[in-house]
Amino acid sequence: MVNSAVRSLAIVGGVHGNERTGVEVVRRWQQKDFARYFPALKCHYFLANPRAIAANRRYINQDLNRCFRPQDRKNPYLMGYEQLRARQLAHQISLAGIDFIVDLHTTTAAMGTTLILNCPHPLLLNLAAYLSAQDEEIRVLQYSPQKDLPYIRGLCELGLTIELGPVPQGVYDPTAIAKTQRTLARILAYLQASTSGNVPAADNCTVYQQIDTIDYPRDEQGQIVAEIAPHIRDYQAIKPGTPLFYHRRGNVTPYQGAATVYPVFIGEAAYVEKGIAMALTQRKTIAI
């Protein structure tokens, strides 16, 4: 059985101001006090980037979800709006004694419902395995290990992101809101039950571990010169030699890796400026 010491949660929306789903979910849960259904848990709500939310923009000066490394928060010369917000949020989360963070996001990529985990902590893996069994659409993603995560969910060890897509930027999507609320409620129900050891432990969890990112082919001026091949789909296997990009002049760029990989965040609109057309993962089954 899984026994959790989680008592205090942060539910975060609006880290990216044009991802309206998380903003709406936080507002609804706070206004309607949905947390009363989970009395063993203390829920704290955060709308992370108020100016960007008001402007319906991803960010004001820079991506807030790249501002949470400890060394950046301690740097007195970093004074952009999001850098200041990162310090404020880190302070508030620390004062509240938060021991679990759920960060709500959407993506323009057709990824369905994805859980992005901080680390392979047994509680996170058991939770992810439980949720995957509840909803076959759910996939579990882990980024490459980093000592100091730049994401808000990295402010405590037990953190995860709910990432839902495809959802266009800046829109109110009732279906995405409903799916996010359902997944969030299941997370809280699991954590509530685990405080008294009332959930079974899983044997393993299937995880997609990020190993690389790929940019679009570009010319000498940095302009994109090719399109992602239409048969490339999120979480669908890419084998060596598979065409990845079709160029406007008719040539093809194939996948040149040596092993089968599984792409995610395919064509994510916000990642063009980061030089990312897609991320590549390996699918693994991790024993818990």
Swiss-Prot record:
Disulfide bond annotation, renumbered to this chain: none
Keyword set, alphabetical order: Hydrolase, Metal-binding, Zinc
UniProt GO molecular function: aspartoacylase activity; hydrolase activity, acting on carbon-nitrogen (but not peptide) bonds, in linear amides; hydrolase activity, acting on ester bonds; zinc ion binding
E.C. code: 3.5.1.15
Enzyme class, UniProt record, top EC level: hydrolase
Binding site for Zn(2+): H16, E19, H105
Catalyzed reaction equations: an N-acyl-L-aspartate + H2O = a carboxylate + L-aspartate
Amino acids binding substrate: R58, N65, R66, E163, Y271
Keyword Metal-binding belongs to the record: yes
Reported cofactor(s): Zn(2+)
Pfam family, one: AstE_AspA_cat
Note describing how the cofactor binds: Binds 1 zinc ion per subunit.
Gene Ontology terms: cellular component: cytosol
Origin superkingdom: Bacteria
Protein family: Belongs to the AspA/AstE family. Aspartoacylase subfamily.
Protein name according to UniProt: Probable aspartoacylase
